[in-house]
């Protein structure tokens, strides 16, 4: 059985990688799909191409994981790919309420099942938004993101990191 792991991945975090790595042990193939999210329009730090490149680098050691992108309804993408399972990571109960609603809708309109994977406890506080904020101040992020994301964030916020490194 194959699955799709969708998200905006702006950037991919260690929490994403934890869920993805565990999903890669559960499914024959997992397609990490960078989705266009209309609610996040204009709020991405990284371009689509940058996010795809970061993900390709971060997932290079996972042979049954491939990276793709899509703009549209997730259930349409899942059907086009011949998949029937969506993987979603959960950090807290508040994530579950929202994800449960989406899972029910996806099953109703696309006959797609959703598998929830709880983030490891030590990643439950990590979000892409928080990582970007910490990075924007030159803070330490190496434990919260894979090396590819850290390098990309350091490039985006080079001026801030250069000042901290010189101090």
From Swiss-Prot:
Family matches, as InterPro entries: Cyt_trans-like, PPAT, Rossmann-like_a/b/a_fold
Gene Ontology biological process terms, A to Z: coenzyme A biosynthetic process
Co-factor requirement: Mg(2+)
Pathway(s) it belongs to: Cofactor biosynthesis; coenzyme A biosynthesis; CoA from (R)-pantothenate: step 4/5
Segment forming the signal sequence: none
Sequence positions that bind substrate: 8, 40, 74, 88
EC class name: transferase
Residues of the site described as Transition state stabilizer: 16
NCBIfam families assigned: coaD_prev_kdtB, cyt_tran_rel
Subunit structure: Homohexamer.
Protein known as: Phosphopantetheine adenylyltransferase
Organism of provenance: Deinococcus radiodurans (strain ATCC 13939 / DSM 20539 / JCM 16871 / CCUG 27074 / LMG 4051 / NBRC 15346 / NCIMB 9279 / VKM B-1422 / R1)
């Amino acid at each position: 059985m194959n699955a799709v792991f969708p998200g905006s991945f702006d950037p991919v975090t260690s929490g994403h990688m934890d869920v993805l790595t565990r999903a890669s042990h559960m499914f024959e193939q997992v397609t990490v799909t960078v989705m266009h999210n209309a609610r996040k329009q204009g709020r991405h730090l990284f371009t689509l191409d940058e996010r795809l490149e970061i993900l390709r680098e971060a997932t290079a050691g996972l042979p049954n994981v491939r990276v793709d992108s899509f703009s549209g309804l997730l259930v349409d993408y899942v059907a086009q790919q011949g998949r029937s399972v969506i993987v979603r990571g959960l950090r807290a109960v508040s994530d579950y309420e929202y994800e449960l609603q989406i899972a029910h809708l996806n099953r109703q309109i696309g006959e797609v099942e959703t598998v929830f994977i709880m983030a490891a406890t030590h990643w439950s506080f990590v979000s892409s938004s928080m990582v970007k904020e910490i990075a924007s101040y030159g803070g330490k992020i190496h434990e919260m993101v894979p090396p590819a994301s850290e390098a990309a964030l350091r490039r985006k916020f080079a001026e801030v990191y250069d000042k901290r490194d010189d101090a």
